[in-house]
Amino acid sequence: EKVNMRQQNTWMCYQRKEEKNVRCADAATARPLSAQRLGSPMGNTLTAYTDKLCLIVETNGLKNVLHPLEKTDRYLWGSLSPDGNRILFTAVGKGTYVCDLKGKVLAEIGYLNAPVWYDRDRIVGMVDKDNGDYITSSSVVMVSADGKQRQILVPSTEKAMYPAVNRSSGRIAYNTLEGDIIVLELEK
């Protein structure tokens, strides 16, 4: 099902050719989003994100740089779990992991690029391959947050990339190399 994401009022993620990192924007306003924020009635905020290849947890405006893996300091795609207790991130050249808010690794997910939380127990990302010049295959995969279960949602022949999740509807959107945006609705 092809849908105009602006009409869906969901977050869109896209990659700019001149930059190496993924930018997210609110589809309704096109306002850039750099992080997820969870707020409580007391006004406290907790955010997890990556900036300049650093993994950062921000609590009420106070930033703390995490170093969950000893032999790397380059991180991408950091995000806070829906329950606010864990951080999902990719260590460049190492793989994707889940850690607690202090940086203790809780699970190794393995190779999964552009990972996003689907819900508190599942993650969606892409498993892509290239030949050095262009993408040769890319599938959208759902993985349990402990890394033990894996399910292919879109086969690699589709060259499905950069999944985005709308948690309230349970839908997953991804783009193809041709520029199409496809929306999946998972059976409950």
What function would you assign to each model-found segment?
Residues 1-188:
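Sequence signature of WD/YWTD-type beta-propeller architectures
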